[in-house]
């Protein structure tokens, strides 16, 4: 029996209704004559507190509230890829057809096109035993995505009694019948799943495979693993959104879920305009063919921001269960936390630090704990991952505020954006002294097996140079660079070269926007070798001025833009030229 009550109190997106004794926590309800979508977030006796996902303008006490009997759920099936949804999985294209440029209230529409036909290829036969997660067949969703039709995780399983033959079917067709205890349960191409409930998996693995983003400062110095968690905190204008766009564009994942949570609408427009024209570097297909957008911009209802995060991560888990690597980018979790703060204030809860609710930390933990690299349920055996990257927008760039400090407890990769670097035109403005990665030891084996055995040692040497330069900066500030010996002046010179030739990256340059792991390693190795050979040359009597005047320095700084990923021999030639020029300075062969 569904709950039926009446509105007694309205305060912004929060509504109180009585006569709701039949309602359940987190049940979806329709509110008012306009049938606005809402969710029960607190029950006191027969009074329900409801957060409404649409504008409550014009609602008045006495209007009806009706329960649906179901929690807030998303529809999972073919047709999700390439869509742009609002926070509760309503496709914005369909909403614009119904209500024009401004979204009307109380509009409901199907998240995917139920009449579109897909070519289904069955992978089980009549009489086969199936369990939750078993793949019964596949359809081609886009040129990049083979979509597995799976037995839902909450299904009882059983024996296949009937299955359709290969052919074209729409989403409402019964694809299979599964018999269990004398009952036949029909299975369609889609099913629904509650957004607040994590999807089940068989086994969770340690994150040992790096997520290659093509951004040198991330992949080389502060890597993130597939199935890992990362955060990009930064104040206004530090380049959070462009950095997240770069990760969404170039990360080596099969699916990208991009959640615009409370940010400017123009940023989502940028993604919509750019992605269809950009090609996936591995498949040469449009990036929109692997992307799902959840747009909940700053002028949309506040309550739907919270839902948008859960909607996005549930879609990500669904594709993970197919055995795909998924990257979920949330921009920004601070706006989500602000939505929690606003709802908490409306409900008159006791505020904690800076007005945020006391359960902020547990909500952040719930979100980040849904990341991971797993073996999916059922057969065939397949591994997938969900990597979560959240932007944090601390007001005034203050990293001690609650959202940043709580986020740091639950993530292992922290990319701290620095306003000073951004204002000096150093992008991505990731501060190499404040950032860290907890995945370095886990993924070093992959780099050793796939790129170079000495990758970790080379990376440590390069990072050591940057750390020493940071300590020397204080002396230089007080006494000037002339107070340093030549060996330390060389450290300053090589650190400057690393910042320009390695750490800086132009996301708008066709060559430099993406850097392959092999090119990253060779650029890194050349910088470290330049330093080692410089130290050796100084010991053998060479002048620092001669080292600074070497023509190869210009080549080292420009190699990131001049040499493409498929032109690795040119980098070897550059290393050879560096060798020869050092020989010319010292007059003897320098040991490598």
Swiss-Prot record:
What this protein is called in its record is: A-type ATP synthase subunit A
An MF annotation (GO) of this entry: proton-transporting ATP synthase activity, rotational mechanism
Q: Which UniProt keywords apply?
A: ATP synthesis, ATP-binding, Cell membrane, Hydrogen ion transport, Ion transport, Membrane, Nucleotide-binding, Translocase, Transport
What Gene3D superfamilies would the database entry show? 2.40.30.20, 2.40.50.100, Bovine Mitochondrial F1-atpase, Atp Synthase Beta Chain, Chain D, domain 3, P-loop containing nucleotide triphosphate hydrolases
Q: Which organism is it from?
A: Cenarchaeum symbiosum (strain A)
Description of how the protein assembles with itself and partners? Has multiple subunits with at least A(3), B(3), C, D, E, F, H, I and proteolipid K(x).
Which EC number(s) are documented for this chain?
7.1.2.2
**How is it placed in the membrane, per its record?**
Peripheral membrane protein
Q: Where does this protein chiefly localize?
A: membrane
């Amino acid at each position: 029996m569904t709950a039926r009550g009446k509105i007694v109190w309205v305060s912004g997106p929060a509504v109180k209704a009585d006569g709701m004794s039949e309602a359940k926590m987190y049940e979806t309800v329709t509110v008012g004559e306009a049938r606005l979508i809402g969710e029960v977030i607190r029950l006191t006796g027969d009074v329900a507190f409801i957060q409404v996902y649409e504008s409550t303008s014009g609602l008045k006490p006495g209007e009806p509230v009706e329960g649906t009997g179901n929690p807030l759920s998303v529809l999972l099936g073919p047709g999700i890829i390439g869509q742009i949804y609002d926070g509760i999985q309503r496709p914005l294209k369909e909403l614009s057809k119904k209500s024009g440029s401004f979204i009307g209230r109380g509009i409901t529409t199907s998240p995917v096109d139920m009449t579109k036909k897909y070519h289904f290829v069955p992978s089980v036969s009549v009489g086969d035993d199936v369990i939750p997660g078993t793949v019964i067949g596949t359809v081609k969703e886009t040129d990049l995505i083979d979509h597995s039709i799976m037995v839902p995780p909450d299904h009882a399983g059983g024996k296949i009694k009937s299955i359709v033959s290969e052919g074209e079917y729409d989403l409402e067709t019964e694809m299979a019948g599964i018999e269990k205890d004398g009952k036949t349960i029909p299975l369609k191409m889609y099913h629904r799943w509650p957004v607040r409930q994590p999807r089940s998996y068989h086994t969770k693995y340690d994150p040992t495979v790096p997520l290659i983003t093509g951004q040198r400062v991330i992949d080389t110095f502060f890597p993130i693993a597939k199935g890992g968690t990362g955060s990009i905190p930064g104040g206004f204008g530090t380049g959070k959104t462009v950095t997240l766009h770069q990760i969404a564009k170039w990360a080596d994942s099969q699916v990208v879920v991009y959640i615009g949570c409370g940010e400017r609408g123009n940023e989502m427009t940028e993604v919509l305009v750019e992605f269809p024209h950009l090609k996936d570097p591995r498949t040469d297909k449009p990036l929109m063919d692997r992307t799902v957008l959840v747009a909940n911009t700053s002028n949309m209802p506040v309550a739907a921001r919270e839902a948008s995060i859960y909607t996005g991560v549930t879609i990500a888990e669904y594709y993970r269960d197919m055995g795909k690597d998924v990257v979920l980018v949330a921009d920004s979790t601070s706006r989500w936390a602000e939505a929690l703060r606003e709802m908490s204030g409306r409900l008159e809860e006791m505020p904690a630090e800076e007005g945020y609710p006391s359960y902020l930390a547990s909500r952040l933990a719930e979100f980040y704990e849904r990341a991971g690299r797993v073996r999916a349920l059922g057969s065939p055996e397949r591994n997938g991952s969900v990597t979560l990257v959240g932007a944090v927008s601390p007001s005034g760039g203050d990293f001690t505020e609650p959202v940043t400090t709580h986020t740091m407890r639950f993530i292992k990769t922290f990319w701290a954006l620095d306003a000073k670097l951004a204002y000096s035109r150093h992008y991505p403005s990731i501060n190499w002294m404040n950032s860290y990665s907890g995945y370095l030891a886990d993924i070093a084996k992959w780099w050793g097996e796939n790129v170079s055995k000495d990758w970790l040692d080379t990376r440590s040497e390069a990072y050591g140079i940057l750390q020493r330069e940071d300590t020397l900066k204080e002396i230089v500030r007080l006494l000037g660079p002339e107070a340093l010996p030549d060996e330390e002046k060389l450290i300053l010179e090589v650190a400057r070269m690393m910042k320009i030739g390695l750490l800086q990256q132009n996301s708008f340059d066709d060559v430099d926007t993406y850097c392959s792991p092999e090119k990253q390693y060779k650029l890194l190795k050349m910088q470290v070798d330049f330093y080692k050979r410089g130290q050796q040359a100084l010991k053998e009597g060479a002048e620092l001025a001669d080292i600074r005047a070497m023509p190869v320095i210009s080549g080292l700084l420009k190699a990131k833009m001049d040499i493409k990923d498929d032109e690795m021999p040119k980098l070897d030639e550059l290393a050879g030229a560096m060798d020869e020029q050092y020989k010319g300075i010292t007059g003897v062969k320098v040991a490598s």
